[in-house]
């Protein structure tokens, strides 16, 4: 039997996910955040214009001098001018700056006047307050009317008392009673007159009777003598 030599092939190692992750982390370089040595150009421009206080407006050259004197902008003058021009144009477009004369970045610049909020809101709030106060006054007026109505109702009830109703009734009764007294007086007056007229007739009769009686007595007494 002849022996056959078998050649062994080396095992190939497959890369794992962990090895890929470590390689990726090794290749990435952390970025260092560069802190700006100065604020944005528009902020520096507004500061320069407010401090320069030029009636006609501050020129780009005056603004550039103020910025470079206060902040460290580096030695690249052309780059600084380019940033300054673009910031001036953006300031005019955004109405932060007003260009008094010139075109583009050339000329003079002033700060835009801050627009006051419309007074309509204040007027509206004032109207609301007035409406509230008027409503309160109206409510209080209604309450006052109710109280006055109650008071007047009480007064009317007091006025309609039985005493005042009884007084005119008494007056009417007295007037009616007075009328018959007058008629009675008129009726009694002729009766009294008739009685007075009838009285002398009786007196005359009595006189006649007295005259006749002594004549009869004289006739009876004559034979006795």
Swiss-Prot record:
Positions of post-translational N-acetylserine modification: 2
> What residue spans carry the Basic and acidic residues bias annotation?
145-156
Arranged from A to Z, the UniProt key words for this protein are:
Acetylation, Chromosome, DNA-binding, Nucleus
The GO terms this record gives for MF are: double-stranded DNA binding; nucleosomal DNA binding; structural constituent of chromatin
- The H15 domain is annotated at 37-113
What SUPFAM superfamilies does the database record attribute to this sequence? Winged helix' DNA-binding domain
Primary location class? nucleus
Q: Which Gene3D superfamilies match?
A: Winged helix-like DNA-binding domain superfamily/Winged helix DNA-binding domain (1.10.10.10)
Biased composition annotated in UniProt, kind: Low complexity: 9-19, 176-208
Q: Where in the cell is it found?
A: Nucleus; Chromosome
Cite the PROSITE patterns for this sequence: H15
Role, per record: Histones H1 are necessary for the condensation of nucleosome chains into higher-order structures.
Family to which this protein belongs: Belongs to the histone H1/H5 family.
Protein's name according to its UniProt entry? Histone H1.5
């Amino acid at each position: 039997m002849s022996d056959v030599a078998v050649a062994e092939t080396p095992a190939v190692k497959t890369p794992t996910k962990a090895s890929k992750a470590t390689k990726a982390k090794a290749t990435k370089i952390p970025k260092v955040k560069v802190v700006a040595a100065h604020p944005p150009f528009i902020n520096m421009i507004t500061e320069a214009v407010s401090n320069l206080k030029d009636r006609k407006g501050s020129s780009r050259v005056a603004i550039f001098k103020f910025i470079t004197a206060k902040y460290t902008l580096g030695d690249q003058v052309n780059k600084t001018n380019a940033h300054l021009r673009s910031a001036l144009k953006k300031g005019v477009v955004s109405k932060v700056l007003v260009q008094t004369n010139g075109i583009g970045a050339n000329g003079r610049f002033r700060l835009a006047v801050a627009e006051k909020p419309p007074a309509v809101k204040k007027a509206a709030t004032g109207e609301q307050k007035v409406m509230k106060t008027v409503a309160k006054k109206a409510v209080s007026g209604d309450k006052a009317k109710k109280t006055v109505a109650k008071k007047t109702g009480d007064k009317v009830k007091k006025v309609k008392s039985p005493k005042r109703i009884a007084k005119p009734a008494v007056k009417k009764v007295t007037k009616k009673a007075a009328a018959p007294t007058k008629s009675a007086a008129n009726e009694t007056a002729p009766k009294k007159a008739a009685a007075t007229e009838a009285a002398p007739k009786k007196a005359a009769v009595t006189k006649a009777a007295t005259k006749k009686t002594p004549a009869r007595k004289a006739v009876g007494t004559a034979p006795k003598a």
